[in-house]
Amino acid sequence: VTCRNHFPRDPKTCILQKTYTITDIVMDEHGRLKKLLLEKSYREGTFNLSSGKTSNFYVDGKQTTLSAEGAYLCGRLLYRLIRDHHENITGVGGMTLGADPLVTAVSIVSYLEDAPIPAFIVRKEPKGHGTDNYIEGKNNLQPGALVAVVEDVVTTGGTLVKVIDRVQSEGFRVGLVATVVDRQEGGAEALESRGYPLVSIFTRQQLIG
C-alpha cells in the first residue's frame, strides 16, 4: 500500500521504513494543520470581528479549511475530537459559511472510517423558497438525533449559541461543541454556562503563543 504525504492513513496496512503509532500520526497531522493555519489564516493588524470586537490579529479559517490539505486535516482531527469526547454523536453541523467545509470534511472522514456521520448546515435565514429550510441535510438525521456543532474560529461563542438554539428548535440534541481555533475571548465560558463545554484543536495560546 502506498501512503501519501509520508504518513499512513491506516498504520495496519501501510508498509514504510518507519513504524508509526496512532500517536505519531495524530502529532504529525496536528503539526501540519498548525503550520497551514499560520501560513494561510493568521494575520496581524487591526481587524473588526463578527463579535463587534476589535483585534490586533485575525484567523481567517476559511483560507485553510477550503484548501485540500486543510480540509482533510480538519476533518481528521475534528472527527477524532468528536469520537474521543462523545462516541454516540450521529450528526455534525454548523452555521454557514464557516462550518460548511468542516462538516463536509468530518462527514467524509467518518465514512472512510466506516462510522458515517451525516452533515447538516444551518442557514442564517430560511431558504425563502422551495422547502424553506433553516437546516439543510436534516432529513439525513433521525428525530431527536444527538449532534455535534462545529465552527472554524470561536471568539465570544455567539454564532455557536445561535446554532445550538436553532438545532434544538428542530428537535435535535447537542452533545458536543467543537472548533478548530478557540481565540480564548470568552466563547468557551459562554458555552459552558449553557451546559456545552467547548473542545478545540487549538487554543490561541497553542497556535500563536
Task: List PLM regions with ranges.
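Short, glycine/charge-rich flexible loops or terminal/linker lids adjacent to PRPP-binding catalytic cores
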Residues: 103-148, 158-161
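Short glycine-rich phosphate-binding loop at a beta-alpha junction
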Residues: 87-98, 178
